Amino acid sequence: MTRSLKIGSLFLSGVFLTTALTACSGGQTGPATLTVDLSDRHQTMEGFGASSAWWSQEIGGWTDIGQSGKEVREEIMDLLYSEEGLGMNIYRYNLGAGTGTGEKPGVFTDSWRSAQSFIDDNGNIDYSLDANAVWCMNRAVALGADKVFFFSNSAPDTMTITGMPHSEEQRKKVTNLAPENYQAFADYALDAVEHFRAQGIPVIAISPINEPQWTWQGGQEGCHYEPDEMVALYKVFYQEMLSRGMTDDVELDMFESGQFGGSKFKKWFKALAEDETLGPVLHTLSGHSYNSSFADKEKTAKWLKKNYPDLKIRCTEWTEMTSGRDLGMDSAVIMADMICNDLKILDAISWTYWLAVSQYDWRDGLLYVDPSEPKPQTYTLTKRYYGYGNFTRFVKEGAVRVGTQMDRDKELNSIAFEQDGKLTMILVNSSAENERQVSFNIANANYQTMTTWLTDETHDLEQTAQTAYSAQGSVTLPPQSIMTVVLE
């Protein structure tokens, strides 16, 4: 059950202990076996997070006092970043492109899709701007976020060809940033990185190009780049970072691809990867999972591992892209299935959700807020929020993914990690009708206890069992459920 609160309880619902999982009503198919190979070690995780785009510039100003005695903005950030909440450790700060303090030039679907830059009405740098979003970033860091990524959808509108942070209808597949402004954009972005690092913000990467494959002709911030234009801009960024001595501390993130796979991936990727200057210094590819099928990702992963075996991958954006708000398990199990697949197929070292907070009639935010104006400072938690917690609260930085194999089954998915002597398994049952029993086959396991945490129709990331572990241990997954199993 979701909650609509002024400021709700921070803690993730009531916790109760039982000696076994309670069987659920409904259909049941045959049992499945999850085999875990502790010696089959894959990527080491950086963590999980969310993007600040489109919500932090408003939520950071929500200073009403709620039932807990805290400001609403504090409660929301606690839910996302405190250890009693989701405990995320990655924050993607959107380096906005709208200059000045008044209405921003451009054609936007709504006010949330225009983000403020640090350029004031007189063209001067002012780091007191974008104050609400900066407050959210500072709060996330105070709560434990130790990795901040700066990303730009567009250069500031004062630098663009159209004078807006997007192109125009008649300018299809044409960049909006002239070459003579590449240096100005690099200076602006890197100045911001240096400023906030000096303030104690752990900015570890800068991503100046976001989904360059698309045309970005209005509706939100964005900039198209052809592959050669992208390479030219990246060379300016890299040379400027070298001259500032930043390359040891701040990573120049390879472009954030709008998809994993297809010609629109390879063409842009190869332009950077095969460049004599950039290829040797770009070590991590960020990509978005919106427009990529399971088969696309498998094909891309195989190609990357063969040709670029040292490349690391971060999955930096995903949401379901389906209209209609959903508070329940339908979208939660789709999200959990996507996370499992991205981490297993792509060996992604991190996974970052797109909209942490949404005002839209889409299956997107982890939390929803009211779209009416002026907005009441209330929010609603979703099952996606709790389901994301099945990953974020248990799989921490330094966890190593280990090999898993499950009987071929379209309804079930799984993933496992080892860290500090613990084995954490996340199981997903996407069937709306059938509960599923899953037994474990773990060679050379020396665990004493098994604890389970469940998100389903009636549980919000609740501890549902704590028992002695046996080699023939098993769990029962209710229909449409996400379960975290921790062996110690």
Model segments located where?
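C-terminal beta-strand-rich structural cap/linker in extracellular carbohydrate-active enzymes
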Residues: 466-488
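Bacterial N-terminal signal peptides that target proteins for export
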Residues: 1-11
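Structural recognition of the beta-strand scaffold that forms the well-ordered cores
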Residues: 44-52, 88-95, 147-151, 204-208, ...
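C-terminal motif of bacterial Sec signal peptides marking the signal peptidase cleavage site
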Residues: 22-23
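Aromatic/acidic polysaccharide-binding cleft in carbohydrate-active enzymes
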Residues: 312-393, 402-410
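Carbohydrate-binding surface patches
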Residues: 407-446, 480
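Active-site neighborhood of glycoside hydrolase catalytic domains
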Residues: 184-191, 195-202, 212-318
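N-terminal catalytic cores of secreted or lumenal carbohydrate-active enzymes
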Residues: 31-204, 224-231, 235, 239
